[in-house]
Each structure stands twice: as C-alpha cells, then as structure tokens.
Amino acid sequence: VRWATPVTAFQRTAVVDTELAGVRIKAGQRVVMFYRSANFDEEVFDDPNSFNILRDPNPHVGFGGTGVHFCIGANLARMTINLIFEAIAEHMPDLTPVGAPERLRSGWLNAIKHWQVDYTGSSATAL
C-alpha cells in the first residue's frame, strides 16, 4: 500500500487562514496531499525508493495514517490484504507475470485493471 497506494491524493479546503510548512494558506483555498510524496519521505523511510516487503517499521499513510480522519475499516482491510497475499503465496508459489499490467490511472486513483499471470500449479496446495 505504501509503494502504490490506490488513492493517490486527497484535497481539503482551509476553513481558516493557516500556515503549513511555511506556506500561508487563506481560508477557502484548497490544499492537496499526495500520498506518494508522504509515503516516500526520506525523513521517515530509510531508502524509500527501494521495494522491501519486509520493511519494519513501515509507517505509511495508507488508510489515513492516524487522527480524526483515520479509516474505520483500516484493520479489516489490512487483515484482508494479508490473507489474500498469504493464500496466493501458498497456492501459487511460482506465480509469474506473462505481460505488463494494464493500469488504471487518474488524478486521484491508481489501480491494476488487468494483469495476465501464469503458474504451474505444482504446489501441494495448488487449487
């Protein structure tokens, strides 16, 4: 989720004049946060551009981070993602891509629409 977050950005409208990281923001102005920027912050992540599935700690801001806008379904989503990847690894340990993924890209969303893969099914637990 840190590497390729499905929601790429969100915006908020300032309700009062404020300052953020030295930038003055007037009431009514919009502010956009790009998750990719936050999730690759060199002050938070050692070598943020390296893909490391075992990264620990991994304090990404997927599901809203913490605070009043924290996603109420975050724990269920994390558990579901873990179960899905564990099942894939168990049943298709030799899963290999056949081609490049077909991606859905927009100003706000990032997803894989279609990705053809192959596996031998030689695992003892293969479906």
Protein language model regions, located:
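Conserved cytochrome P450 K-helix E-x-x-R motif and the immediately C-terminal K′/meander segment
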Residues: 1-21
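Cytochrome P450
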Residues: 5-8, 37-43, 47, 91-96, ...
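Cytochrome P450 heme-binding Cys-pocket and its upstream "meander" loop
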Residues: 38-79
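Conserved N-terminal glycine/acidic-rich loop preference
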Residues: 67, 75, 105-124
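Cytochrome P450 heme-binding "Cys pocket" and the immediately downstream C-terminal segment
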Residues: 76-104
